Amino acid sequence: MTIAATEALTRCIEHREIFHDEMLHLMRLLMRGELSPQIASALLMGLRVKKETVGEITAAAQVMREFATPVVTPNPQDLLDMCGTGGDGSHTFNISTTAMFVAAAAGVPIAKHGNRSASSSSGSADVLEALGANLQLTPEEVAECVAATGIGFMFAPAHHGAMKNVAAVRKELGVRTIFNILGPLTNPAGAANQLMGVFHPDLVGIQVRVLERLGSRHVLVVHGKDGMDEASLGAATMVGELKDGVVREYEIHPEDYGLSMMSNRGIKVSNREESRALVIEALDNVDGVARDIVALNAGLAIYAGNKADSIPEALALAFETISNGSARAKLEEFCAYTRKFQK
């Protein structure tokens, strides 16, 4: 065991924060596979039991970004990511993935970071493939997609190869660790703007402050009070916002924007084909909960992407983009463009 690991474990046992430089060092050891499985497991569980701090998560995210395979674009400060933690257990269709087509059609350049299903019925990569997208793209091809269509999708395993060094430990543990909240913090394109859904209310304030330290521009971190890692129509939504260097926390309610409170029962799915059907239904402007929850989340994305000065203005733009067909057209454009790169 390294001296740094011994000190870190002692700090976890005593519920004290691991110093920033120590956390950087330990994460580099983890990402290089230089800690034994026993020490890696002890460290991950120690952090979880102690509860990871903003400083520790920030350091861990910085190291994951160091090890990531980047996507280079001319203006990362304009890009928006829409990547949630997942793990909310709601089994709803892919709301944020659908909303990205609406936001992109409204002029927000999207660099979405996503993966296959871990705990849900359909991950973002799963449903995009069901919709006809090719996700086996090089970083250069992703950047070309962003330039040509306004959307790039970065399949997480292709950009975070070092994660293979902790995969066995995570699988053996079988419980959430710090890595479950690092994914949305490690966008390979360096997107400065973000709409992030989180599975636990405590993460709203934590993640927005981590992104503040990481230098983000405009961020909304959301948690539906019915447990969703999205803005919800079934309950109020907690929001942590970073804008102009200032963090605010507040709640939004569907009724504030003229939306009806609706149950999420009608948007639960059990596989990617059911999710695909609801994506199409929402983008085809079929009246109902699928369309409205997509519009709500797309509105927040448009606001976070700085294409509207307020949430009400952004929500109106989201509904307009759905109703005039441009969001559905954006889906078709993106999928067709990615297929150009099929080997």
Curated annotation (Swiss-Prot):
Anthranilate 2 binds at R170. Its EC number is 2.4.2.18. Its cofactor is Mg(2+). This is Anthranilate phosphoribosyltransferase. The lineage of its organism: Bacteria, Pseudomonadati, Pseudomonadota, Betaproteobacteria, Burkholderiales. The gene is trpD. Transmembrane segments: none annotated. It catalyses: N-(5-phospho-beta-D-ribosyl)anthranilate + diphosphate = 5-phospho-alpha-D-ribose 1-diphosphate + anthranilate. GO terms for cellular component: cytosol. GO terms for molecular function: anthranilate phosphoribosyltransferase activity; magnesium ion binding. 5-phospho-alpha-D-ribose 1-diphosphate binds at residues 84, 87-88, 92, 94-97, 112-120, 124. It comes from Bordetella pertussis (strain Tohama I / ATCC BAA-589 / NCTC 13251). Keywords: Amino-acid biosynthesis, Aromatic amino acid biosynthesis, Glycosyltransferase, Magnesium, Metal-binding, Transferase, Tryptophan biosynthesis.
